[in-house]
């Protein structure tokens, strides 16, 4: 099977030198991309462990919050709990920034939410129970875990995308570009050697022709001198 080479390449020494430089850059880039891929994969699995921990904490917190809510509904009644929830004041401030992981911008969240009193929450002290207070506290704690879970899951998604893109670039260089450059180098080198051999044969033929003509001229001159002597 014919080897893959760069189309339309000119088999010249300048082209060969340029191609060798391109091959060196491709090999260097391949090495750097492999390092980036490996670092991203390590970061991915480090954060994946964190995802598992945060998800478990969020699920546990939500379970406790729902259990507390159920106790509040039993103590107060479902309608009273709904009425109290409508008067709750929203007070969640999430600061979202970013950090770079091997060139990938991933989110960093900071939840600014202090523990609130009954007055801060906005519902009536006289119409509610301690069970509702506990449920509200549990759900507020759950929100922090859910926001953190969103942060780490988004980070995992972005890293996974970049890992796949980096893998594609590594494979393209390793299996397509670098072999194509190397095959083209071999092709140019082979053609240059062929042209050198052709030039050598051509020069040898020219030299032989010149020598033959010189010999013929010398022989003709000798014959002419001999004829003049005889005359």
Curated annotation (Swiss-Prot):
The protein's superkingdom reads Archaea
What's a BP term from Gene Ontology annotated to this protein? Answer: proton motive force-driven plasma membrane ATP synthesis
What Pfam families does the entry give?
Answer: ATP-synt_D (PF01813)
**InterPro entries noted in UniProt:** V_ATPase_D (IPR002699)
Question: Example GO molecular function term?
Answer: ATP binding
Q: Does the keyword Transmembrane helix apply?
A: no
Tell me, in one coarse class, where this protein mainly resides: membrane
What is the membrane topology listed in the Swiss-Prot or TrEMBL record? Peripheral membrane protein
List cellular component terms (GO). plasma membrane
Matching Gene3D superfamilies: 1.10.287.3240
Question: Partners and quaternary state?
Answer: Has multiple subunits with at least A(3), B(3), C, D, E, F, H, I and proteolipid K(x).
Question: Which PANTHER family does the UniProt entry name for this protein?
Answer: V-TYPE ATP SYNTHASE SUBUNIT D
What does the function comment of this entry state? Component of the A-type ATP synthase that produces ATP from ADP in the presence of a proton gradient across the membrane.
Give the family, as the similarity comment puts it. Answer: Belongs to the V-ATPase D subunit family.
Q: What is this protein called?
A: A-type ATP synthase subunit D
């Amino acid at each position: 099977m014919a080897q893959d080479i760069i189309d339309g390449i000119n088999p010249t020494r300048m082209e060969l030198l340029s191609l060798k430089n391109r091959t060196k850059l491709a090999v260097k880039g391949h090495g750097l991309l492999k390092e980036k891929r490996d670092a991203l994969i390590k970061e991915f699995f480090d954060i994946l462990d964190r995802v598992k921990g945060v998800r478990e904490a969020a699920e546990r917190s939500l379970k406790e919050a729902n259990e507390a809510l159920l106790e509040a509904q039993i103590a107060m009644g479902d309608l009273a709990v709904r009425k109290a929830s409508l008067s709750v004041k929203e007070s969640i401030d999430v600061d979202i920034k970013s950090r770079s992981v091997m060139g990938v911008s991933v989110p960093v969240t900071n939840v600014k939410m202090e523990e609130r009193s009954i007055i801060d929450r906005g519902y009536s002290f006289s119409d509610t129970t301690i069970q509702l207070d506990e449920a509200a506290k549990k759900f507020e704690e759950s929100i922090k875990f859910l926001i953190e879970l969103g942060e780490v899951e988004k980070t995992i998604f972005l890293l996974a995308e970049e890992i796949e893109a980096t893998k594609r670039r590594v494979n393209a260089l390793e299996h397509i570009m670098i072999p194509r450059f190397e095959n083209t180098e071999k092709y140019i080198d082979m053609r240059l050697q062929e042209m050198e051999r052709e030039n050598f044969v051509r020069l040898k033929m020219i030299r032989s022709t010149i020598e033959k003509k010189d010999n013929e001229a010398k022989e003709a001159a000798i014959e002419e001198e001999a004829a003049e002597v005889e005359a």
